[in-house]
Amino acid sequence: MTATVYCLMPPSADALQGAFVFAALAFISELKPVSVRTNMFEVTITVPIVWASMVLFGPLSAMLVAGLAVAGANGTGWISARVMIYLRSKNRMPRLQNALATIAGPWEDRAEYPAQWVIQQILSNASQDAIAVGAAAIIYNAIGGNIATHEVLVSVPVAEIFTHFIIPFFIAVLAYLLIDEVRLIMAIILGENRPEDTRDWYSFFLRCKMLLIESLPVAAGQYLLLPPVTLLMLYLYVHVGLISGLVVVGPFLALRSAVQK
């Protein structure tokens, strides 16, 4: 039994161009996150974009997508917070202040921080996201994920679709989830108290283990709907091209508006 598999990177498309377009989509979604929350459940459109980049463009370009999106969104958030505070001090343009507050997000509380600290924080956030996506992309390639690299229309046995795409993709997704959770947990713990002696390090690793066990089931629930969205983006990319991201973002924007009302 065979199935027709369309190239996920059309021959006429440029990989670097596609990576920059996906980075722009991820940047927009970082500025105005699309989420649906029920207790601890959250869905964001940014992760499917970087996962699709991981499959479509390979490790280096996927890291570029994640890093540019996070760095751009963080930098824009800080600048928006600075402008908003200036306008507020002058009591000018209240509507623009509200718009800037939405973009600034958590950076509103850090608007007065020195530029050197902000740059270090932005580079740290961007590099962490890039490393997580890059590691997942390397794992995807290492365990046989290669269907997305075909540049022609081919007929492939269904078994090959599973061994060279579906299975590697979900293993890479699990790796991304684990890396992302570990880095967040370590950042939280190290931010509270840095280990100094052997006993501190033992407590540090024990707490990391406990938090990881507690957070993984919650994170798995949060990421539950993201693989299907990623697969939808990959499918649409074949037939629609680089604007496939907009096709996916539209329904999520409508869904968020419905939930927020």
List each language-model region with its residue ranges:
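Hydrophobic, membrane-inserted alpha-helices
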Residues: 1-3, 26, 45-51, 224-233, ...
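Membrane-embedded alpha-helical segments in integral membrane proteins
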Residues: 1-9, 53-54, 137-145, 229-231
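Short, hydrophobic transmembrane alpha-helix segments
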Residues: 2-16, 31-39
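Transmembrane helix interruption/hinge and helix-loop junction motifs
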Residues: 10-12, 54-65, 235-244
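Alpha-helical membrane segments and adjacent membrane-interface helices in multi-pass membrane proteins
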Residues: 19, 23-141
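Transmembrane alpha-helical segments that form the membrane-embedded catalytic/substrate-channel core
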Residues: 27-33, 170-190, 254-261
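Alpha-helical transmembrane segments
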Residues: 53-55, 59-64, 157-178
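Interfacial "cap-and-anchor" motif at the non-cytosolic start of specific transmembrane alpha-helices
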Residues: 186-261
